[in-house]
Amino acid sequence: MKKILIADDEHKIVMTLEYAFKKAGYEVFIARDGSEVLEILKEQIPNLILLDIMMPNVDGYTTLSEIKKNEKFQDIKVIFLSAKAGENDIQKGLELGADAYVTKPYSIKKLLEKVEELI
């Protein structure tokens, strides 16, 4: 079973994504901020992380930078999910090593397709 880690501090978004990905056959892990992502990665290696940028404590950019520093995590695909839709935001996310950048609001169907494409 493929594993996906959803990192977002907005409860409704997390619940919607969790439902959709479980229904699609994924094992789902949840983090509310970047520090929780890094804690989960000590125990689980997901195939992909859906990573919000604007989260409390440790933001998505910092989280991705920390992930990319660790060779153990190099094969994990990362999709940024963010309301930050500016060209500079998208460019920064991709330069940090994200495999894709999806702006909110988004279609769950298209997001599932993007995840399938990457993993």
Q: What is each stretch, according to the model?
A:
Residues 106-115:
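C-terminal output helix
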Residues 66, 104:
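A Lys-centered signature of the CheY-like receiver
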Residues 30-48:
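Acidic, metal-coordinating helix/loop segments flanking the phosphotransfer/catalytic sites
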Residues 55:
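Receiver (REC) domain active-site loop signature in two-component systems and cognate sites
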Residues 15-23:
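Charged docking surfaces used in two-component/phosphorelay signaling
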